């Protein structure tokens, strides 16, 4: 679920940036998404959005699905092995790892999405 996803982000980035900093970034980080991603981090969010969309097509509710995971050496690892729990956990873990690798550019936080995300 979204709280677990936030915790995964903290795991992967070693707590260097609050999870909420990703909630309004670029064209895809946060609710919805459109246009061309503004950078590598925004692309991570686009991939995550697409993963959640695929989960929805499988009959899952990714923003609400509780799963089992652990943080080992700043790497989120899924314990859930089947069904929606496994699928959603994999979406979140991949995104958290992607976020940790991508540069965070403050100028892409809280952008005017109407102008920049066409």
Curated annotation (Swiss-Prot):
EC primary class: hydrolase
Catalytic residues as annotated in Swiss-Prot or TrEMBL: 48, 92
InterPro entries tied to this protein: PLipase_A2 (IPR001211), PLipase_A2_Asp_AS (IPR033112), PLipase_A2_dom (IPR016090), PLipase_A2_dom_sf (IPR036444), PLipase_A2_His_AS (IPR033113)
Tissue/organ expression: Expressed by the venom gland.
One GO cellular component term noted in the UniProt record for this chain: extracellular region
Reactions the enzyme catalyzes: a 1,2-diacyl-sn-glycero-3-phosphocholine + H2O = a 1-acyl-sn-glycero-3-phosphocholine + a fatty acid + H(+)
GO biological process, one term: lipid catabolic process
CDD domains for this protein: PLA2c
Residues noted as binding Ca(2+) in the record, renumbered to the chain: 28, 30, 32, 49
Cofactor entry: Ca(2+)
Keywords assigned by UniProt, alphabetized: Calcium, Disulfide bond, Hydrolase, Lipid degradation, Lipid metabolism, Metal-binding, Secreted
UniProt keyword Hydrolase, yes or no: yes
Disulfide bonds: 11-71, 27-117, 29-45, 44-98, 51-91, 60-84, 78-89
Enzyme Commission code: 3.1.1.4
Cofactor note: Binds 1 Ca(2+) ion.
Function statement: PLA2 catalyzes the calcium-dependent hydrolysis of the 2-acyl groups in 3-sn-phosphoglycerides.
Family: Belongs to the phospholipase A2 family. Group I subfamily. D49 sub-subfamily.
UniProt name for this protein: Basic phospholipase A2 PA-12A
Source organism of the structure: Pseudechis australis (Mulga snake)
Lineage of the species this protein comes from: Eukaryota, Metazoa, Chordata, Craniata, Vertebrata
């Amino acid at each position: 679920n979204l709280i677990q996803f936030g915790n995964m982000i903290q795991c992967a980035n070693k707590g260097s940036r609050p999870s909420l900093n990703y909630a309004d970034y670029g064209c895809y980080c946060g609710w919805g998404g459109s246009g061309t991603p503004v950078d590598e981090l925004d692309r991570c969010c686009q991939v995550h959005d697409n993963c959640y969309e695929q989960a929805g097509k499988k009959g899952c509710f990714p923003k609400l699905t509780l799963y089992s995971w652990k943080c080992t050496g700043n790497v989120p690892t899924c314990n859930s092995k089947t069904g929606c729990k496994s699928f959603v956990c994999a979406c979140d873990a991949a995104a958290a790892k992607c976020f940790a690798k991508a540069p965070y550019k403050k100028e892409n936080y809280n952008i005017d999405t109407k102008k920049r995300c066409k």
